[in-house]
Amino acid sequence: MSLSIVCLDLEGVLIPEIWINFAESVKIDELKLTTRDISDYDVLMNKRIGILKENGLTLPDIQQVIEGLDPLPGAKEFLDALRERTQVIILSDTFTQFASPMMRKLGWPTLFCNTLETDADGTVTGYRLRQQDGKKKAVKALSSIGFSIIAAGDSYNDVSMLKTADAGIFFRPPDTIIDEFPQIPVTREYSELLTAIEEAAVTI
């Protein structure tokens, strides 16, 4: 796998969905919506930002919840095993202000993500994407310098990355996404995902 890079989504693949956990903490069901439910990321984020403002919730409120979260069971061991075999880059639509506690618990893997915009009191006023469709463009850029790319994710916002990669694999996606993209193989356990990655590396 020396000429391969594995690109992984973060939330739902290695860590819990941050917005779902925050929604449960503050008891606002609308904040439970994720890219597994709404395919348009801008629509989703503007909805989230509006709900935060309506309820007087700030970035520190979200960060407090994140500090109490751990990676998904088995995620750190899976990531360690994968990094022994090849290079791994996490491509995520999360934000730098959310990521640090989880990156520390995962052993500081390489992460490409986005940034939240806040005012002086921590109110979230907007967000800044690294670039539009950044996951797909990162895969294309890595391919252009001679790497074969294997990608794994679970949501609508991962599909373009999975289709662009030399091999794309779903990990624990909802049934709606499986039905919509039946050509993408599905894995449910980290052992399955690791095997699927190893098998893909032989064939690409």
Residue ranges of each PLM-predicted region?
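Short acidic-hydrophobic, aromatic-tinged amphipathic segments that line or gate anion-handling sites
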Residues: 112, 184-193
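Substrate-recognition "cap/lid" segment bordering the active-site pocket of phosphatases
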Residues: 97-149, 180
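Short amphipathic alpha-helix with an adjacent loop that forms part of the alpha/beta core around
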Residues: 195-203
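Short, well-ordered alpha-helical microsegments
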Residues: 96-100, 158-159, 194
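Acidic, Mg2+-coordinating phosphoryl-transfer loop and its flanking beta/alpha structural elements
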Residues: 88-93, 147-188
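Alpha-helical substrate-recognition element adjacent to the catalytic core
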Residues: 2-115, 119-120
